């Protein structure tokens, strides 16, 4: 075996190893108990976020389900140019929480989690709980009011306070 073949084989093994590290979504997205049975680390991260920010785990998990269907690398669909060609994405939303670039930077700065990754479940659920905790203070929403917390999450607290969610078909 020559050196080039060994390099190609090594690269292939490395890529296969890295691919196995990528988390696929849970099989039954509608059953939080099954999700947590399959992903014990997710349960621990969700409970840690609940303790830290005071937002119920069920609320935070519902947001991640709605935003990304538990896909680590989720992005908004691209707009189409001339009905065929893929264009730009409508926003910078990315990851489990579909957090925008600017909001994620604010989270990193204000939460003390400066090395957070939007494709990390534990970072994403902490982000969702952090954002919801801020919404309870800024927009006077109860911690267990998932519907109004989601309106504030989707529209931003400023949009929520202006009532922009009322004009949308949910």
Tell where the protein language model's regions lie, with residue ranges.
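C-terminal motif of bacterial Sec signal peptides marking the signal peptidase cleavage site
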Residues: 17-20
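Catalytic glycan-binding domains that act on GlcNAc-containing polysaccharides
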Residues: 24-170
């Amino acid at each position: 075996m020559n050196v080039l073949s060994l390099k190609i084989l090594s690269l292939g093994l490395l890529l296969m190893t890295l691919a196995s590290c990528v988390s696929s979504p849970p099989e039954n997205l509608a059953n939080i108990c099954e999700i947590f049975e399959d992903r014990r680390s997710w349960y621990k991260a969700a409970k840690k976020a609940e303790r830290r920010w005071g937002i119920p785990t069920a609320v935070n998990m519902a947001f991640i389900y709605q935003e990304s269907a538990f896909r680590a690398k989720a992005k908004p669909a691209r707009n189409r140019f001339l009905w065929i060609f893929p264009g730009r994405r409508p926003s910078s939303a990315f990851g489990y929480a579909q957090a925008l670039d600017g909001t994620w930077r604010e989270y990193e700065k204000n939460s003390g989690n400066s090395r957070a990754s939007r494709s990390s479940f534990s970072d994403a659920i902490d982000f969702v709980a952090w954002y919801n905790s801020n919404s309870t203070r800024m927009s006077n929403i109860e911690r267990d009011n998932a519907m109004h917390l989601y309106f504030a999450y989707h529209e931003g607290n400023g949009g929520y306070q202006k009532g922009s969610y009322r004009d949308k078909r949910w």
